[in-house]
């Protein structure tokens, strides 16, 4: 297949949300004196992360609104300790999100891959991340010059994996489905979403997870593997 257009996910495909997000949470833990609730950061992290993953899955499927996600993910870990004020969680979320914009660690091989791809393809970001932080993260981490446009779910009015998100990106990038491939780490949002939109997929799967229900067009365990495909 000859591709001309690359739709690329941002978080945990290019921008290292696991490392950067963990750093921000550890700063929050110390600055907000969370040792009063959890003796160690690891204990707090192990409570926060499962809830955060669950809420993001609900957000992707349109089951909750952004406002519910950003409040509940910070309120849930401290609710057992009598903290129930949504405005407190909102302030904490705003602080956390601002901190993420200053983190610049990328997935290993990101810039080398983008340097290789830039002369050959038109590249676009497709992300469910929040508008107020994604543009800053992209710019501060040096990714902006590589991409023709950045497509966010908030601008499209729907999230990956919904087909409307992919249709929005195709239309606004003047791209054809059969000349486009989606690159991402999320099975549900990126890979299943692209397949359901009749777009080929490259699954970035560093954890060697099993596919669910179908075989993606391509699978790689590191970003360097994409150079063998494109």
Question: What is each stretch, according to the model?
Answer:
Residues 127:
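Conserved phosphate-coupling serine/threonine residues in phosphotransfer and NTP-handling enzymes
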Residues 62-63, 102, 123, 154, ...:
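A generic structural signal for short
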Residues 120-121, 198:
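Glycine-centered short loops/turns at secondary-structure junctions
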Residues 51, 119-120:
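Structured helix-beta-strand junction loops
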Residues 2-108:
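N-terminal helical cap/lid subdomain that shapes the substrate entry/recognition surface
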Residues 1-6, 19, 111, 115, ...:
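Asp-based, Mg2+/Mn2+-dependent phosphohydrolase catalytic module
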